Amino acid sequence: MVNQTHSKMHISKVNEVYLNLEVDSALGQELTDYFTFDVPGAKFMPMYKKRIWDGKIRLYSQKTGKIYCGLLPYIKKFCSKNSVEYILEEGIEDDRNLIREDVRKFTESLRPKSKGKKLDIRDYQTNAILHSLRKHRSLIISPTASGKSLIIYALVRYYNLLLKDKKILILVPTTSLVEQMYSDFIDYGWSDKYVHRIYSGHERTTDKPVVVSTWQSLYKLPKKYFEDFGCIIGDEAHLFKARSLTNILTKLENCKYRHGFTGTLDGTQTHRLILEGLFGSVEKVVSTKDLIDTNTLAKLTVKCVVLKHPQEECKKVKGSKYAEEIDYLVDNSSRNKFICRLCDNLSGNTLVLFQLVEKHGKVLYDMMKDFDRKVFFVYGGTDTETRENIRAITEKERSAIIVASYGTFSTGINIRNLHNIVFSSPSKSRIRVLQSIGRGLRTSSTKNSTVVFDIADDLSHGHWTNFT
């Protein structure tokens, strides 16, 4: 509890990244404790093991007084909880006074279309656009197939009119998503003369007002490069590496308009607060359940297939570490044959997700490539154009199999005509699992349901149980 004799705070704005909290040392220590969090899994990290780092992240610096602008609601909550009087400098809160109907009319005026057909703007999309434009900063939770790209498109078109001499930067985690965002904008009806793409092999400088780039292409660039941008939009924000995301967004010191988009947060407070601090407060526009109930998304069935391994094998694996257990599973020929038979017997298009390329993905592909159906292999080394071609071909197929790494196909890739998803490798990432399921939730003219096959393994022996 804050000492009542030290209960005043002056909040000023340093730039579009940081606020400054002017407090005495006692209150500063309370703030430090309040905004300090344990990093999940820190004990496994080299810096922690070497005792160079204590495994905590501190979002408030008592030394500088700085804290991310997006954490203002949490600062107010701290003050309210601890009876701290605060003075907020004028201009820090400057919500734009917008009317919902005006936002709806603006979005309608863009006349967005897909494959030549007019797109209807859903109410929750209008709400998301309104919230973002009013607040200037936001973190929009928008699940798969909720029309997130259209929300981003409307924001980009609005800021393109508003920011006469500034550009708009859209950051995505993969080259495939650069191409997908670009093609979506063109599909909606915009000209390519407005949009520039950046990833390996593309120029980083352009006169075009909108730049779509992977964060990997930009995070090492100097602060001066980012001076031209007045708006930053981060798509699939949950996948940005914390240090790289922080690196880019803290260089955008004069970038007022900041919007992050994600379908999933990882459930940890640290993850959420970093994203909210760099972008803005969380706003959930619609739930996956709502979209399924209204038939916007496909009906979902999850089938957990538990493979009981022979006791003599279980005895060999008993006491193994997680990585050793994974090595055993991906190298297990009986298990791999079962996965291949399962995929061959499924009707419709099937996505098989794996974790280890050489040890597992390549093995599964080699076992399936002679099936009497089209089988594709996608991993990190597959170039962007090939991935796009595979995606396009699969949309027209009825019985294709894509053997793909989690990293390339678990997030953001749109394949409407996907009937089955098979998890051939275990994954400990909550985000990865949820995003992977999202790949199959889009509907198409040939599909209104999706089945997810989660392959689990029972290697228990005596009182010992395995990880997976």
Language model regions located:
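Post-DEXD/H (motif II) to motif III coupling segment of the RecA-like Helicase ATP-binding lobe
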Residues: G230, H238-K303
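Conserved RecA-like P-loop NTPase helicase motor core
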Residues: T264, Y379-T468
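Conserved helix/coil segment N-terminal to the catalytic DExD/H
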Residues: S200-C231, K241-N247, T408
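Walker A/P-loop
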Residues: K135-R157
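Conserved pre-motif I regulatory segment
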Residues: E89-I141
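Conserved interdomain hinge at the start of the Helicase C-terminal
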Residues: V317-Q355, K359-M367
